[in-house]
Amino acid sequence: ALAIGADAAFRIDIEPDSSWEVAKYISDFAKTKAYDLILLGKETIDHNGSETGAMVAEFMDLPYISYCNKLDIDGTKATIAREIEGGTETSEVNLPFVLSAAKGLAEQRIPNMKGIMDAKKKPLDIIAVDKLGSDLELVRFELPPVKSGVKMLAVDDMDALIKILHEEAKVI
């Protein structure tokens, strides 16, 4: 991003366990900066849940538009378009807001040599988690209990079905 025109870049130095944690740290950091638009990818490379943008918006109490593939900003308003089943949905929203990008929002730009060299002079601020002032505390992270396997019965074995429903499932 620095090589194609961004003025500054920030990286929050974490190894997250969940999209919720990523969203919390992004929102805590963003609250310390001036912004009009918080732009995220449709899916994150860490968890692919397509949920980080929505959680950032919720933590910051901002409007959220997902899967945006067209964006026009005019003053304090933005017009957003996104593909939906059967057509295109167009929305208007006031700045600031959170947006998750879909394919087609921007053309990929390959940086030229001058941009790459200039990027080396621009700062990449690495933010330590303890400097964010976040109230996030991971108490526990555990997997759900393992479910029992599926039992296959012959179509005509009603006696076995009734026995399982009565003795194991306890529904009859």
Region roles according to the model:
Residues 1-172:
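N-terminal glycine-rich FAD/FM-binding segment characteristic of electron-transfer flavoproteins
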